[in-house]
Amino acid sequence: MVTIKEIARMAGVSTTTVSNVLHKKNARVSEQTIEKVEKLLAENNYIPRLGLNALTNRSSRIICILITTPEFARGSAYETPFYGNMLGNLERLLRENGYYIMIFSDKNVEEIEKMTVGWNVDGIITISMPYRHLKKIAGLSDIPIVSIDMDEMPEGDEVYYQITSEDKSGGKEMGRYLIGQGVKRIVYLANVNHGADHLRFVGVREAVREADYKVLLEEKRLPKDYTQREKCYEDFLKYVGTDTALFFSTDVNAAEMISFLHRNHVKVPEEISVAGMDDDIFASIVYPRLTTIRVNVEEKAQTAVDILLKLIRGRNVEKNVYKTSVKLIERESVKIKSLNT
């Protein structure tokens, strides 16, 4: 296997220059030298010896991504479109900056803690980790940490670097949209009653309170088990034909509900409206296509990577809490109010 020293000799440059090209530290390297070194690296099939760096005190170029598997997940977190989309964006962005990812997901936070201190990583990105666990992990080392969608965060606590969506605004925007279509009842269905799911409900509740006419609002928590969820869905068949909208905290469950309604010969949206949140892959492939709130996953990932790289490089980060945009995506699953009514 060719070494950095051999590449440097062939290119007529120092090993430091080759290392800078490898790690995308190109500020002091000319374009001509970069092209020359990259060509030699490709021609000689150079493979970085990352494993050695990970076991020493040197920079490993590895970023650890810690995922707290949601309690409502059927299996691993990776089965959920949101996590797959987020991981794909993080991997691409970090690779473009010369870093590699190590992923660890578990419902057992103690296992995650062991993972944190067991490897020499340059930084950590957590996804959906409860505040109390993030606080504990942050106290185990000085490794820079950025949190995406921190759960159970105390109000006003801005100690840790965190990225989240405008969940409350998203819920309110959907609530206003549904009310604008003349619904008389909104049923909000979520997997949990805290974190993003709860904030989305708070937004819907505000929209209902500000409505020009009386709108009934119900909040339901979805069972973890699929069979139990089916029984839960049966309860809402009584609302067919009553100007009701079922607003789910995730598109996955909204698509599941539409499938259930089809099997029970209920027409969506003619007899009942269904809406979701996230705008994941299910929103555009289910029939009818789902009206939803788009959560900008790419913006979340980009913001997290930008902040983490600043922390790793010792640069100033302007603030601790960043909120990314949301957007109403109108498709065909909500009954549109007639202009004649």
Regions found by a protein language model. Give the residues of each.
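N-terminal helix-turn-helix DNA-binding module of bacterial transcription factors
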Residues: 1-59
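Short beta-strand elements in bilobed, periplasmic/extracellular small-molecule ligand-binding domains
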Residues: 91-105, 185-188, 205-229
